[in-house]
């Protein structure tokens, strides 16, 4: 055989391919062998009886409807059928011919279909247009042939008309129901069958579909109870394993979105892969629960409750057409009244004399034997008892450090503004065209909103819809005062009523000023009379015949040498000194006589 030299200078021998018989369809590559476990006879079941203990008695059967041709080659595989009547399949019913279970598992490589010998163009038959045999949905039994099918196949010509040969050395039996449509071998087998079929091929009259029928056995109470017990035990063990299992988180994305409070301790951080930036995330719901977790949770709950209460107050103010601060003021007044009632009740209560006032100094007590001793009870002061008595009417609050968290918006005066409805916007533009930019009048239409909020809404609308604002301001509407009073739900009155009230106020003011002048004059007269009486009483004669005014003048110039007490003390000291000298002289005289 001559060799060929390619462009690179490499000499190689061409491959020799054997000739194939001409076929009517397009040539297709040989697909991978689908692996099915099909028991051939009872002898194989007896040889493998040790492996059949856990398998159910009901087995699936591959049944082929009678066809005109006893043997048909399919991409290198031989499938045999019988020429029986349709009554053989009719006994099973329509339920038995089920489709393939999509959730079954892929079987192991136990059995392969027998490759068919190559056929000539004369012997080649038109391939069947039916799809591959569907598999049963029942996973409780393994495939098996029906007796009629096995008998007919055994009577056919030789071993070439058998479906497949099965090895006696089977390591393990696997159910056919575990084959899924996702099996790669099955998919390639189907694809090559479709590609190998010619477009002009027609389904012959005797061609029938090969279907796998599962035998349905009636359930028993024992099997159902056993299955339930096994399932419950498996679920309980799986739950216990899940409860005791710990998880290692290597990325922030691996953290579950919803983690229960009790399960957060099961998640651990991979210290080698985690960075400080990831650890500084604001929400990191894994790890051991600290002591402050419950406090923060309670603070968050209280914050949401307060927010809900304010929302209800705003809704109530909108419905009752009242300002929001009036509702809050009513609540504050009610709380203050309750505190006053509790305080008055405590003050009017009868408190024992011992509890009324605590002793500030150590006291003495008389013992039964007549001796005096220190009262030990007065040496101890119970401040908590005194505080509880004095502050019993006050409200006791346990402070939570997480309740009042401060940020850049904590010290601002901004309040939440409810969104404006369509009716409010219509009223707003109508008021603009009627009253202009007098926001004091416009804010009366919205008592549950402040003037600041109305002005902010005007500025916002002027930015978003300047044309509408310009049209509303230029198209002046005639002011309707009665309609305005009806909308604000107030009776302002007419100009005549206003003038009458003004005259009444002026008269009251004049009368009040007259009363003030009269009070000033009477007070001035009283001061003058009191001054005259004081002057008359001051300038009187004293005990020495000197007037009080002259005595004051003399006392300003006199010098004080001492007081009477000082003179008495001085005289007493002199007497004592004289007595001491007399005593000393009397003691010296007897000594001289001796």
Swiss-Prot record:
Gene3D superfamilies: Homeodomain-like. One of its GO terms (biological process) is DNA-templated transcription open complex formation. CDD domains: SANT (cd00167). Residues 225-241, 317-330, 520-529 have a biased composition (Basic and acidic residues). It is found in: Nucleus. This is Transcription factor TFIIIB component B''. The keyword Nucleotidyltransferase does not apply.
């Amino acid at each position: 055989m001559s060799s060929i030299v390619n462009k690179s200078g490499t000499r190689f021998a061409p491959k020799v391919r054997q000739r194939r018989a001409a076929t009517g369809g397009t040539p297709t590559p040989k697909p991978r062998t689908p692996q099915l476990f099909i028991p051939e006879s009872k002898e194989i079941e007896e040889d493998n009886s040790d492996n059949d203990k856990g398998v159910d008695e009901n087995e699936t059967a591959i049944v082929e409807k009678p066809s005109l041709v006893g043997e048909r080659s399919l991409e290198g595989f031989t499938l045999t059928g019988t020429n029986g009547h349709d009554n053989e399949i009719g006994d099973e019913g329509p339920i038995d011919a089920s489709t393939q279970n999509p959730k079954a598992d892929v079987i192991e490589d136990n059995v392969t279909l027998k490759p068919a010998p190559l056929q000539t163009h004369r012997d080649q038959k038109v391939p069947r247009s039916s799809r591959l045999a569907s598999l049963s949905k029942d996973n409780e039994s393994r495939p098996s042939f029906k007796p009629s099918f096995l008998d007919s196949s055994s009577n056919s010509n030789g071993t070439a008309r058998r479906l497949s040969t099965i090895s006696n050395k089977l390591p393990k039996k696997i159910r056919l129901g575990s084959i899924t449509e996702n099996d790669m071998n099955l998919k390639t087998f189907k694809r090559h069958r479709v590609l190998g079929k010619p477009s002009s091929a027609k389904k012959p009259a005797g061609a029938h579909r090969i279907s796998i029928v599962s035998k349905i056995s009636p359930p028993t109470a024992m099997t159902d109870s056993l299955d339930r017990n096994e399932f419950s035990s498996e679920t309980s063990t799986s739950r216990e394993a899940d409860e005791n299992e710990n998880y290692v988180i290597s990325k922030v994305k691996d953290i579950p979105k919803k983690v229960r409070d009790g399960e957060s301790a099961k998640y651990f951080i991979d210290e080698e892969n985690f960075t400080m930036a990831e650890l500084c995330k604001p929400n990191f719901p894994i790890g051991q629960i600290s002591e402050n977790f419950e406090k923060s949770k309670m603070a968050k709950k209280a914050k949401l409750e307060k927010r809900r209460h304010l929302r209800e107050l705003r809704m109530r103010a909108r419905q009752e057409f009242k300002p929001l601060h009036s509702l809050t003021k009513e609540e504050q007044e009610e709380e203050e009244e309750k505190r006053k009632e509790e305080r008055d009740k405590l003050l009017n209560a009868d408190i024992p004399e011992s509890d009324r006032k605590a002793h500030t100094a150590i006291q003495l007590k008389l013992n039964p034997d007549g001796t005096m001793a220190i009262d030990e009870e007065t040496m101890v002061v119970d401040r908590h008892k005194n505080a509880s008595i004095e502050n019993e009417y006050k409200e006791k609050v346990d402070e939570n450090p997480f309740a009042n968290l401060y940020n850049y918006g904590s010290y601002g005066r901004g309040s939440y503004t409810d969104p404006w409805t369509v009716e409010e916007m219509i009223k707003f533009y109508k008021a603009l065209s009627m009253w202009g930019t007098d926001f004091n009048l416009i804010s009366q239409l919205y008592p549950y909103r402040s003037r600041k909020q109305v002005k902010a809404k005007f500025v916002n609308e002027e930015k978003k819809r300047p044309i509408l604002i310009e049209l509303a301001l230029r198209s002046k509407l005639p002011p309707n005062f009665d309609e305005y009073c009806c909308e604000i739900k107030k009776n302002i009155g007419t100009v005549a009523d206003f003038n009458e009230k003004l005259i009444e106020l002026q008269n009251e003011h004049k009368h009040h000023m007259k009363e003030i002048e009269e009070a000033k004059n009477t007070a001035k007269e009283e001061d003058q009379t009191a001054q005259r009486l004081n002057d008359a009483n001051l300038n009187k004669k004293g005990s020495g015949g000197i007037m009080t005014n002259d005595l004051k003048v003399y006392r300003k110039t006199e010098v004080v040498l001492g007081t009477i007490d000082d003179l008495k003390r001085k005289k007493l000291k002199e007497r004592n000194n004289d007595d001491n000298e007399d005593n000393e002289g009397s003691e010296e005289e007897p000594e001289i006589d001796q």
